[in-house]
């Protein structure tokens, strides 16, 4: 009888452990995690949002190496894959329109991500502290890059902001110390406060001709940046926007507010 009791207990524990490897993550979404570390999200509609006090059901399992999000999923929930420090690969389908805040925060092993043409919003701190992220493609569908979206992605070397983007949030690329060049598309109107703060390897920046505001500390601490051309559209440059970096700046001849300076 005792042996039978122990056998039943062992079986229940095993079933419980198995049950924790699958479940729901939205009204019409399901998730499943294999022993090989492949996490699959299937179904239709929005993914649930999570936060630090209520993390995702797979958060405690540090074996997640690959995430496959099925076609039909429309949002990636806040903090959905936060702290999945073994994650190296993620597949995002064309049905996704929003990448939630802190969605991939602290994914230390993630090296590249392709954001599909359906995504319009990259939430704040979405890829914060993804230390290994070297490759990034932002499609023409994105209109908003949230505050701190790529904060301290130390390995990121270059980025092109497409013409669809209108706002680059505060600290969006701050601390990206390997970033050497930035091209800002012609639809961007605002470069947020500290957007590229501390990008110490940044040597080249092209500012599109629709930018009206460069926030305070926007390029502060970009010690390798020696020159920048400010278009005629700019009417506001925040304090310390270029502190600790450029020795000269150029503006278009018709810009009456900010004359060219060569120190």
Question: Where do the protein language model's features map onto the residues?
Answer:
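Sec-dependent signal peptide recognition
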Residues: 2-8
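N-terminal signal peptide c-region/cleavage motif recognized by signal peptidases
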Residues: 14-16
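Boundary of Sec targeting at the N-terminus
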Residues: 18-20
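Surface-exposed ligand/attachment interfaces on beta-rich extracellular proteins
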Residues: 22-30
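A composition-driven surface/loop motif
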Residues: 25-26, 48-54, 58-60, 68
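STAS-typified acidic loop motif
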Residues: 29, 35-49
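Structural signature of tandem-repeat unit edges
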Residues: 38-44, 62-75, 85-98, 108-121, ...
């Amino acid at each position: 009888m005792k042996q039978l009791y122990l056998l039943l207990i062992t079986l229940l524990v095993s079933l419980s452990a198995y049950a924790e490897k699958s479940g729901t993550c939205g009204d019409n979404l399901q998730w499943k995690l294999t022993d090989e570390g492949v996490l699959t999200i299937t179904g239709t509609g929005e993914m649930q949002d999570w936060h630090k006090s209520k993390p995702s059901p797979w958060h405690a399992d540090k074996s997640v190496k690959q995430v496959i999000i099925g076609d039909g999923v429309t949002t990636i929930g806040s903090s959905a894959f936060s702290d999945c420090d073994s994650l190296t690969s993620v597949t995002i389908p064309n049905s996704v329109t929003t990448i939630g805040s802190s969605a991939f925060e602290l994914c230390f092993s993630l090296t590249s991500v392709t954001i599909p043409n359906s995504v319009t919003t990259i939430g704040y701190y979405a890829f914060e502290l993804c230390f290994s992220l070297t490759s990034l493609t932002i499609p023409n569908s994105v209109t908003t890059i949230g505050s701190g979206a790529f904060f301290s992605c130390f390995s990121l070397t270059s980025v092109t902001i497409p013409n669809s983007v209108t706002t680059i949030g505060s600290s969006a690329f701050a601390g990206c110390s390997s970033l050497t060049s930035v091209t800002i598309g012609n639809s961007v109107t605002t470069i947020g406060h500290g957007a590229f703060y501390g990008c110490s390897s940044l040597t080249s920046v092209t500012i599109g001709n629709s930018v009206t505001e460069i926030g305070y500390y926007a390029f502060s601490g970009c010690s390798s940046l020696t020159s920048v051309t400010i278009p005629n559209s700019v009417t506001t440059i925040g304090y310390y926007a270029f502190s600790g970096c450029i020795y000269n700046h150029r503006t278009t001849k018709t810009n009456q507010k900010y004359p060219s300076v060569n120190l």
